[in-house]
């Protein structure tokens, strides 16, 4: 019998490669907990690519069990799921094999079960969970849907997103009430769960970043870059609607203002599955935009950039891309939504801009002023290194999981 209490951690997808913010946050938390108070069993779908991921798996858990993914994410099934009482994203996560695998693991009576993302509650057994239970949320999902409705381009899309928001809010409330503790990734999200959804048992952990992995290497250069052109970078999964919306807004409203003052400036967009429509539109307009698609490591792209831009108008939770760029030494221009939930100070750790005119002006301000670029980059990195290591975040999560567990 293990001397340590057993923790069962259920992820809705295989965690490697770390190609999304959710996977990065989850693996950072698990790495921070590995070797600590718990013996950790990770449960998730099998690796989809058939590659050997044993070393990566061993870095986050003591044991790994899986199920073969049997979800149906076809366009036709997405359309049918609009008629479901569940939000589409939750309906698509339903898996008979997943439910059976989780039920078998719970039957072994671990001391704690953690479900990663609110969607994963659809895989949990009905009725009260048999052991201490923790729900790890990464966003306020219903708020994301509401913001998608706000920025939708036509009445039909707005109506669909509003319907999905209502379904998601109901699902979030019902799911969270089943857990002993709900973990949020920002005080703002925690307040929403308490005040809007009536969830009392909410705890908050900070967002962390591995400052050793994302090593500080600000781009050299003490010049005004507007003449020769600055290199901008955006990182993020390009199959996530808020990222698509943000770049479409940048294309339509702000980019022309930037290149009017700095004609040779270019943008590199680093992230999986860029929509063909967006890529084609950038080419049609002759924009100096490069879409990399999926990359193994974003660091070289951010190191090579002069400014990281985050033109988000929708989304939720906290954006790991912000901390990654700051840790690497790349100054950030962001909307309020882009840094939402992160305890950052505008004009100290990043430059804030809301409308298109201000966003373009903020980018140009950084390109023109090498001292400002250096000051913003250094202050942000120093702040992150002192306060937000993954080990600190992992230990905070561990303490929450230990509550009520006999040691």
Report each predicted region and the residues it spans:
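Carbohydrate-associated surface elements
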Residues: 188, 208
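Short hydrophobic beta-strand element within catalytic cores of glycosyltransferases
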Residues: 321-324, 331-335
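A short, well-ordered alpha-helix in the C-terminal region of glycosyltransferases
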Residues: 372-386, 393-396
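Acceptor-binding helix/loop patch of EC 2.4 sugar-transfer enzymes
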Residues: 12, 71-91, 131-170, 227, ...
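Conserved acidic donor-binding segment of nucleotide-sugar-dependent glycosyltransferases
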Residues: 350-357, 365-371
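Acidic anion/phosphate-binding donor-loop and adjacent secondary structure
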Residues: 146, 209-224, 279-280
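Acidic donor-binding loop of glycosyltransferase active sites
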Residues: 180, 300-317, 328-331
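Nucleotide-activated donor-binding/catalytic signature segment of Leloir-type glycosyltransferases, i.e.
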Residues: 262-300
